[in-house]
Structures are given as structure tokens and as C-alpha cells.
């Protein structure tokens, strides 16, 4: 596999078709808007703030997390392979007066040219959409400076996550479009830790992300059965 091949064209196409609705708070990306404050606060807490830091958001899509980190005073670069989502992200940043940079590139190509550049790297809800997640994790490790932080979020692979993320979220509640996720691409925490151990990163903590359908809200917690976030640091 070459560096340029760690892309699933069907995944890119799927998100490009929804690109115009990235910033619709009641559209397909509503869950990302709902969980963004939780993700942002987790990053802020674990990375000791973002002000003045160089940050890379891998798989940034329409820029929901990237823009919020820029508003915290970080110098943010958003990276994605989808042309349409990036155009939406650039337009929204222009409309809101948010200063950040968006680049269409694979993480592997970006890492080859920018090793040790960033204080913080975020890779949220992206690993389950690529053929080779280890390649992405290795590239994130290469891109962050020694002493820097890398954050990964994805979905666990088990019966509960299938029932919650696919049967519940996609088929019954229609929270996200059907076909958004492939359960076979979900990553168990033990598998995630094994991949992290093959890099210069050290796992610093893991937290679960929980959805309550009764009040349509999310919270962080200890249970990592479905969604989870991993905090790592490069020593």
C-alpha cells in the first residue's frame, strides 16, 4: 500500500454528498455539533489549553471541531481528503471570521513534510473510515512535537455498539444516515492501545461518550462500550 492509498473512495463520496449540510444544526451532522463541546473541553483540559498552540485536526470534514479550537486561540490546520467538505469549511470560517487553514491531503503525505510540527493533533471519528488506521495513528505520532498531545476518538466493536450505533442511531432513531458506519471497521480499545504501542505515543487516559435518547443529550463517562476518546502524549 502506498501512502496515497489509505483512502476509501466510497467514504469520501459519502461525506461529500452531505457536505452542504455540515453546519445544519438539525441535519445529518447534528450529533457532531452536540458532542463538539464535550470533545473540545476534553482536549482543552488534557492539553492544558490551546491558546498559542499549533493544532492539526485530522479528518476535519466541514470544520466543526477545527473552528472551535481556532476560537480558543490556537493556530489550527484542518486536514481532509474531501474537496466539498473543505470548501464548506472554508466558507463557514470566512462567514464567522475565524482564522484557520484547510488542506486537502492524506495524513501520510502531510506527515512526510511536517514531522514534529504540531503541539496538539486531534483525530476524531475518522479512524473507522480508513482502510489502515495504524498508518493514520503512526502519522499522527510523527506530526506531533515531543511533549505534545494526540487525541483519537472512534467506536468500540461489539454487540452493544452495533445495536446503539447502527441499529439504533442509523435504522431506528435516524440520528445519522443509514450506511454512515461499518461495524467491521469499529476498533476495540485493546486494538487501539496495541496500535498506539507501535508508535512514540503513550496512552494517558480513555473516556467514553454516552448518548441519552430520552433527552437527546451526550455526556462523557467511564463506560467505553460504544464511543470513546483516547488521550495520548509523545515523550
From Swiss-Prot:
GO annotation terms (biological process): methylation
Pathway: Cofactor biosynthesis; ubiquinone biosynthesis
EC nos: 2.1.1.222, 2.1.1.64
Gene3D superfamilies noted in UniProt: Vaccinia Virus protein VP39
Catalysed reactions, semicolon-separated: a 3-demethylubiquinol + S-adenosyl-L-methionine = a ubiquinol + S-adenosyl-L-homocysteine + H(+); a 3-(all-trans-polyprenyl)benzene-1,2-diol + S-adenosyl-L-methionine = a 2-methoxy-6-(all-trans-polyprenyl)phenol + S-adenosyl-L-homocysteine + H(+)
Pfam family, any one: Methyltransf_23
Keyword Chaperone applies: no
Highest taxon listed in the record's lineage: Bacteria
Residue sites binding S-adenosyl-L-methionine per the record: 39, 59, 80, 124
Keywords: Methyltransferase, S-adenosyl-L-methionine, Transferase, Ubiquinone biosynthesis
CDD domains named among the record's database cross-references: AdoMet_MTases
SUPFAM superfamilies: S-adenosyl-L-methionine-dependent methyltransferases (SSF53335)
GO molecular function annotations of the record: 2-polyprenyl-6-hydroxyphenol methylase activity; 3-demethylubiquinol 3-O-methyltransferase activity; polyprenyldihydroxybenzoate methyltransferase activity
HAMAP family (UniProt xref): UbiG
Purpose of the protein: O-methyltransferase that catalyzes the 2 O-methylation steps in the ubiquinone biosynthetic pathway.
The family this protein is said to belong to: Belongs to the methyltransferase superfamily. UbiG/COQ3 family.
Protein name per the record: Ubiquinone biosynthesis O-methyltransferase
Organism: Vibrio parahaemolyticus serotype O3:K6 (strain RIMD 2210633)
High-level lineage: Bacteria, Pseudomonadati, Pseudomonadota, Gammaproteobacteria, Vibrionales
Gene this protein is translated from: ubiG
Amino acid at each position: 500500500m502506498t501512502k496515497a492509498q489509505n483512502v476509501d473512495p466510497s467514504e469520501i463520496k459519502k461525506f461529500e454528498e452531505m457536505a452542504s449540510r455540515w453546519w445544519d444544526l438539525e441535519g445529518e451532522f447534528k450529533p457532531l455539533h452536540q458532542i463538539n463541546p464535550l470533545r473540545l473541553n476534553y482536549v482543552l483540559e488534557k492539553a492544558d489549553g490551546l491558546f498559542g498552540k499549533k493544532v492539526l485536526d485530522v479528518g476535519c470534514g466541514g470544520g466543526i471541531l477545527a473552528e472551535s479550537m481556532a476560537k480558543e486561540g490556537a493556530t489550527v490546520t484542518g486536514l481532509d481528503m474531501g474537496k466539498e467538505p473543505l470548501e464548506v469549511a472554508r466558507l463557514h470560517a470566512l462567514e464567522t471570521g475565524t482564522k484557520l487553514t484547510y488542506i486537502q491531503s492524506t495524513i501520510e503525505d502531510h506527515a512526510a513534510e511536517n514531522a514534529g510540527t504540531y503541539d496538539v493533533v486531534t483525530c476524531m471519528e475518522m479512524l473507522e473510515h480508513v482502510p489502515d488506521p495504524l498508518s493514520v495513528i503512526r502519522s499522527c505520532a510523527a506530526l506531533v512535537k515531543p511533549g505534545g498531545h494526540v487525541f483519537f476518538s472512534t467506536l468500540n466493536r461489539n454487540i452493544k455498539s452495533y445495536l446503539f450505533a447502527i441499529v439504533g442511531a442509523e435504522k431506528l432513531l435516524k440520528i445519522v444516515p443509514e450506511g454512515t458506519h461499518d461495524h467491521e471497521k469499529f476498533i476495540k480499545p485493546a486494538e487501539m492501545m496495541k496500535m498506539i504501542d507501535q508508535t512514540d505515543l503513550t496512552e494517558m487516559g480513555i473516556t467514553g461518550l454516552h448518548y441519552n435518547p430520552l433527552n437527546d443529550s451526550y455526556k462523557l463517562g467511564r463506560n467505553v462500550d460504544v464511543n470513546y476518546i483516547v488521550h495520548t502524549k509523545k515523550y
